[in-house]
């Protein structure tokens, strides 16, 4: 009943000694299309560099063990000891599945992280000679004593090999080192039995501690396990010994299936929030149960049968590569499900769930296991795809399993669930947090849990992106000849894939007719653009079972600086400029007619033909107008007024059609590429036109092309560095790029010091489609400063282009110390609930304003709508104290003064939003100056010295105060909020601290100096001078001009810092005076394609918005309109009323009675004019209902201000690129981030 060799007992199931997963150098390279060798023997020879040949041969020659197989005899038999009489469940075998018992067995554990391969934990020497059975005994459960059958964890250390299919713990590979290294024979049974008997109570006790220990956190349980269990102390060190020590606790559950987590009956008297929290908890339990069942199905329905199948439909090595880390992921969630059951049982008494998520998913083991799975996912799908194409048995197996499954979910649908799991958790925890009131004991733990899950999901997303990038580049490299220069560029390791998408290349004729179109795969690398043909081979029907990857054939490639985006109509009107003077790639020479017109219309042929028809119709109507002017009679609806209306309507329709053609360009990407020079040596360019799937795709391409070109400049090579980074890592693709460096003031002769900067977002409708994608955030920058003891200066820059441009500057009486941008009030912001703070009247026309605080105590209010710099209001602070900081809330304009006073100006309902004429409410905050203000939803934070005072946002009553720093001589200078935390910087020291917004608890402290030591090796004293949080990044400016970038969570959790961060190699020669953000939201109409606009217009036709003065026409009157609609033209315009005109109504119908009930216009009028009394229809189409839910596009730029410009990456003594500003001039550095799509 037992084999004499544990090694052979699990040879078909164990992981190779060289590593548990697929080798990166294996034959199944991710993304390979169809060139492969079907020989499993050849594949096993390339399993990996760390696998010895003997191990591979042993695995290849060793058959799998089945339930009905005979024992495998070792090549060198040893004396076989007497078999123990210990009984065990019949469902247990060495790595073989018994479907009835699969769902009852769960294993979980911690493992040691290794940089190259997983470490295997081993049992002590006294246990290493345990005999593993190969063939299970049948019906042993009936012979087993009742006392042993009732022990829930009795099989934790049975003398047998662990299960593989239903066993969710270790496979026999974890124990193979003992069978390989140990040359001793098996010892008598008495000693192993003794150790086993003494071990079982310990395991039972530890398991009970693991279940109850979740109340205090799994970390304590892990420490206890690691300290008490001796076999966890000994392990084979296969990786870096400096990695984090982690044990692996194997947990086995009895054959009796544990009850699923289930909430008890709802108690009476629960609040609505408690009821909602119970429902959300039920959703978490149900979602987790479904996820665990899906993981079990992957192992039970796919992996185990494939491993047992004879003949093999998939080799053992490929099978392990496909299902790599699935079992370990199931371990993590099985333990989480056990802990979740305990929490559900005690929910009504504790109502805590957040700390369980923190304890379960903050371990490095979870990140390691999921990272391995995510990184291997592309490779796994590639193996499945190739097996479907070459092995009909495997394809039939997948189809049969899908048909037999209750929900018809494919293997791909099951295996993609781990990638989607954490976003699902985040949504559930967000709902739970929204329904958890402040002060609840679970609120802080939920916020921490949300942070942990978001951080984990971000890391997995980044790793998945990098894995996909590598796979795409590898697939592209295989399509290029080994001797070509492109192959050398791709294999150099210096190329980064920024964007990759399947686009449709189109070729139009001289009249807009479509000549041909074909799908191309376009690759945007960091320094080149590659276009490839897509060739699919094999059976396309397998794409429903696994993603079908293409094989590429490179068509052309070009250096990125030579690529130009040519936008139709960017220089002029859309109709006059909708042409191309350059021959299209693949198109024939233009015809004589096209050459005569010197225009090649690239718009869709339907729109172009309709525009031509409108031009002809307008010429006919103009002739009719001339004939109408010759009529001798006077008719009500046939006169010059009506004829002029016809002409106006057609002209408006032509403008609408031109806009539709321009809208079609929103999905048309035109690239001007360099070609081979002609015979005379002149450079020739050719045009390539791609049709993108939607306008969002084109915006992304134009934006990434623009930023990629900027990234090739000297100052951005490199622009960011990670401290202690390895040689292969680069700045992420989302990293902001230095776009420009400009002087802050136009008068360079004056030594003006920077004070503050704000961005006023103003949409510019004149910008073209590509200009919106490449320009900085639309609007104006207001830069304020001045000279000490002299006057001040304000400079206004326009950002409606790729580089800022000065539009106006004006002097002030004193230097500007602070600025605040105040947007127009929104409806429902809570002001109506306060009787003391009247709401602003919407009809008063309150526009966005900019408030300036000066050194002489002046507070100035300017309109930010235009650059007229009209001062709306002005006042002086109490005691003429310098205004150090300004903040606004829905109720007050707050000013922090030099003498420690907080001045509050109430909101008014007039055109000026704040009452600056009346004396303000003065609140003493402390003895020192009020240096920083922060406006939260329900509170206002004011700093004075090292203390921070929390005030009520409505009444400004002091709620509480706390010390942010222990040194009385240190002041809080900056406060920025993100999620549920506030980061603070101080007047001295290089540390920043994080505080909770609700409990005011100090959560984290980060020393910035450790991030800058490699740039400033001799610098010991560093001070933080500015802070900014934007798009999940914490920007930190220092007094040495260095800017540090640290990642922080974006959601409602705690914004703690977990990553290393990056340091900018572009900075200032002096302290960073400020860090500001410029943000603008692109108009939703820019995302509407021509098809959506046509649908929106049709919806407008079917259901007019607003009352129409004309009655709805009868069905007979729809004939003319339908004929017009069939041609794609709808005559919609504002009709001038003709009822007041003299003369009878010209109609074939009998005249209506002249009474009060007569209609002003007859049905014939409606059939002719299709009247819509809305001038907006002429120019703009109303948005569809779906557009209300369209995701916004956010354009972001970060601006830093300081003295001069300095590149820290240039070598000492090297001239480098000349700085655009002097070392003493006030300078603005502008970083542009990729559009947030």
UniProtKB/Swiss-Prot annotation:
Q: Which SMART domains match?
A: RhoGEF
Locations listed in the record? Cytoplasm
Which InterPro entries has this protein been placed in? ARHGEF10/ARHGEF17 (IPR039919), DBL_dom_sf (IPR035899), DH_dom (IPR000219), PH-like_dom_sf (IPR011993), WD40/YVTN_repeat-like_dom_sf (IPR015943), WD40_repeat_dom_sf (IPR036322)
Q: Where is the composition biased (Basic and acidic residues)?
A: 146-163, 184-194
* Top-level taxonomic group: Eukaryota
Q: Single Gene Ontology BP term?
A: actin cytoskeleton organization
| Annotated Pfam families | PH_19, RhoGEF, WD40_2
- GO MF entry, a single one: guanyl-nucleotide exchange factor activity
Question: Which PANTHER family does the entry mention?
Answer: RHO GUANINE NUCLEOTIDE EXCHANGE FACTOR, RHO GUANINE NUCLEOTIDE EXCHANGE FACTOR 10-LIKE PROTEIN
Record note on quaternary structure: Interacts with RHOA, RHOB and RHOC.
* Full protein name: Rho guanine nucleotide exchange factor 10-like protein
Tell me the classification of the organism that encodes this protein.
Eukaryota, Metazoa, Chordata, Craniata, Vertebrata
């Amino acid at each position: 009943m037992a084999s004499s060799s544990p090694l052979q007992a699990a040879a078909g199931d164990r992981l190779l000694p060289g590593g548990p997963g697929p080798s990166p150098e294996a034959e199944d390279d991710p993304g390979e299309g169809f060139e492969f060798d079907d020989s499993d023997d050849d594949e096993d020879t390339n399993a990996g560099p760390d696998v010895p040949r003997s191990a591979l041969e042993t695995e290849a020659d060793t058959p799998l063990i089945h339930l009905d197989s005979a024992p495998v005899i070792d090549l060198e038999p040893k004396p076989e000891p007497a078999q123990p009489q210990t009984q065990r469940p019949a469902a247990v075998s060495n790595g073989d599945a018994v479907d009835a018992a699969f769902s009852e067995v769960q294993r979980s554990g911690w493992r040691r992280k290794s940089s190259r391969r997983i470490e295997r934990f081993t049992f002590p020497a006294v246990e290493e000679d345990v005999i593993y059975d190969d063939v299970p005994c049948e019906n042993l459960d009936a012979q087993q004593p009742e006392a042993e059958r009732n022990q829930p964890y009795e099989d934790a250390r049975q003398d047998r090999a662990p299960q593989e299919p239903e066993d969710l713990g270790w496979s026999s590979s974890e124990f193979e080192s003992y069978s390989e290294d140990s040359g001793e024979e098996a010892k008598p049974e008495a000693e192993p039995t003794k150790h086993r008997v003494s071990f079982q109570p310990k395991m039972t006790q530890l398991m009970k501690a693991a279940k109850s220990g979740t109340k205090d956190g799994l970390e304590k349980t892990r420490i206890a396990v690691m300290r008490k269990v001796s076999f966890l102390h000994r392990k084979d060190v296969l990786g870096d010994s400096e990695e984090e020590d982690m044990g692996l606790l194997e947990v086995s559950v009895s054959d009796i299936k544990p009850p699923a987590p289930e909430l008890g009956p709802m108690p009476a008297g629960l609040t609505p929030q408690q009821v909602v929290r119970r429902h959300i908890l039920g959703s978490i339990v149900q979602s987790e149960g479904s996820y665990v069942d899906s993981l079990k199905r992957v192992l039970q329905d796919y992996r185990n049968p494939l491993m047992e199948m004879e003949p093999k439909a998939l080799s053992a090595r490929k099978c392990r590569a496909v299902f790599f880390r699935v079992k370990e992921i199931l371990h993590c969630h099985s333990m989480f499900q056990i802990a979740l059951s305990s929490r559900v049982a005690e929910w009504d008494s504790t109502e805590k769930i957040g700390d369980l998520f923190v304890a379960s998913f903050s371990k490095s083991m979870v990140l390691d296991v999921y990272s391995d799975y995510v990184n291997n996912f592309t490779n796994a799908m590639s193996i499945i795809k190739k097996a479907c194409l070459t092995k009909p048995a495997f394809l039939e197996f997948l189809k049969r399993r899908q048909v037999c499954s209750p929900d018809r979910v494919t293997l791909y649908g099951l295996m993609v669930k781990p990638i989607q799991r954490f976003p699902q958790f985040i949504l559930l925890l967000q709902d739970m947090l929204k329904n958890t009131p402040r002060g609840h004991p679970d609120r802080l733990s939920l916020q921490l849990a949300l942070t942990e899950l978001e951080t984990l999901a971000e890391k997995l997303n980044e790793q998945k992106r990098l894995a996909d990038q590598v796979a795409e580049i590898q697939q592209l490299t295989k399509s290029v000849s080994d001797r070509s220069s492109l192959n050398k560029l791709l294999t150099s390791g210096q190329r980064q894939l920024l964007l990759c998408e399947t686009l449709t290349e189109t070729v139009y004729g001289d009249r807009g007719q479509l000549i041909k179109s074909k799908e191309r795969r376009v690759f945007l690398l960091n320094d080149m653009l590659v276009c490839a043909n897509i060739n699919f081979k094999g059976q396309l029907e397998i794409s429903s079972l696994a993603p079908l990857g293409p094989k590429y054939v490179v068509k052309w490639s070009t250096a990125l600086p030579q690529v130009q985006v040519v936008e139709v109509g960017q220089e002029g009107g859309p109709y006059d400029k909708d042409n191309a003077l350059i021959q299209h790639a693949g198109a024939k020479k233009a015809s004589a007619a096209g050459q005569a017109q010197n225009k090649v219309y690239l718009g869709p042929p339907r729109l172009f033909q309709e525009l031509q028809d409108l031009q002809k119709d307008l010429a006919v109507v103009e002739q009719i107008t001339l004939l109408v002017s010759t009529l001798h009679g006077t008719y009500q609806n046939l006169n010059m007024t009506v004829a002029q209306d016809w002409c106006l309507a057609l002209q408006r329709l032509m403008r609408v059609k031109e806009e539709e053609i321009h809208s079609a360009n929103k999905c048309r990407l035109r690239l001007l590429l360099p070609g081979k020079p002609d015979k005379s040596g002149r450079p020739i360019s050719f045009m390539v036109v791609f049709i993108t799937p939607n306008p969002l795709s084109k915006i992304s391409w134009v934006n990434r092309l623009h930023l990629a070109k900027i990234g090739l400049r000297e100052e951005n090579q490199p622009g960011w560095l990670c401290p202690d980074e390895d040689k292969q890592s680069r700045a992420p693709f989302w990293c902001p790029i230095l776009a420009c460096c400009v002087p802050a003031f136009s008068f360079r002769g004056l030594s003006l010091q920077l004070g503050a900067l704000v961005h006023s977002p103003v949409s510019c409708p004149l910008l073209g489609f590509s200009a919106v994608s490449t320009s900085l955030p639309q609007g104006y920058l207001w830069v304020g400063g001045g000279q000490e003891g002299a006057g001040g200066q304000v400079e206004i820059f326009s950002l409606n282009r790729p580089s800022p441009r000065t539009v106006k500057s004006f002097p002030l009486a004193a230097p500007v110390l602070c600025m605040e941008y105040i947007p127009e009030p929104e409806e429902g912001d809570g002001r109506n609930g306060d009787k003391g703070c009247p709401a602003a009247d919407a009809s008063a026309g309150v526009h966005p304003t900019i408030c300036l605080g000066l050194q002489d105590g002046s507070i100035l209010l300017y309109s930010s709508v235009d650059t007229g710099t009209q001062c709306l209001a002005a006042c002086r602070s109490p005691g003429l104290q310098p205004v150090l900081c300004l903040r606004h809330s829905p109720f007050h304009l707050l000013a922090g003064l030099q003498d420690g006073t907080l001045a509050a100006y109430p909101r008014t309902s007039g055109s000026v939003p704040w009452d600056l004429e009346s004396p303000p409410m003065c609140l003493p905050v402390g003895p020192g100056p009020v240096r920083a203000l922060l406006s939260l939803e329900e509170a206002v934070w004011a700093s004075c010295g090292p203390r921070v005072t929390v005030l009520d946002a409505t009444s400004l009553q002091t709620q509480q105060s706390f010390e942010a720093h222990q040194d009385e001589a240190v002041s809080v200078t900056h406060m920025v909020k993100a999620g549920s935390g506030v980061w603070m910087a101080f007047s001295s020291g290089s540390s920043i601290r994080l505080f909770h917004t609700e409990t005011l608890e100090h959560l984290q402290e980060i020393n910035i100096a450790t991030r800058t030591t490699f740039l400033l090796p001799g610098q010991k004293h560093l001070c933080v001078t500015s802070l900014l949080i934007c798009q999940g990044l914490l920007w930190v400016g220092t007094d040495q001009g260095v800017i540090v970038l640290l990642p922080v969570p974006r959601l409602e959790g705690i914004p703690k810092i977990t990553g290393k961060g990056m340091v900018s190699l572009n900075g200032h020669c002096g302290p960073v005076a400020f860090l500001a953000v410029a943000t603008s939201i692109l108009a939703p109409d820019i995302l509407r394609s021509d098809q959506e606009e046509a649908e929106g217009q049709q919806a407008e036709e079917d259901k007019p918005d607003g009352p129409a003065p004309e009655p709805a026409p009868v069905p007979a009157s729809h004939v003319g309109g339908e004929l017009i609609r069939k041609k794609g033209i709808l005559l919609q315009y504002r009709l001038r009323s003709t009822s007041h005109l003299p003369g009878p109504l010209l109609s074939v119908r009998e005249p209506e009675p002249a009474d009060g009930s007569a209609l002003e216009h007859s049905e014939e009028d409606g059939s002719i004019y299709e009247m819509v009394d809305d001038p907006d229809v002429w120019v703009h189409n109303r948005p569809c209902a779906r557009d209300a839910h369209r995701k916004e596009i956010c354009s972001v730029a970060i601006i830093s201000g300081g003295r001069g410009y300095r590149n820290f990456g240039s070598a000492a003594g090297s001239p480098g690129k000349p700085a655009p500003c002097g070392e003493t001039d006030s300078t603005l550095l502008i970083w542009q981030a990729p559009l947030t799509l």
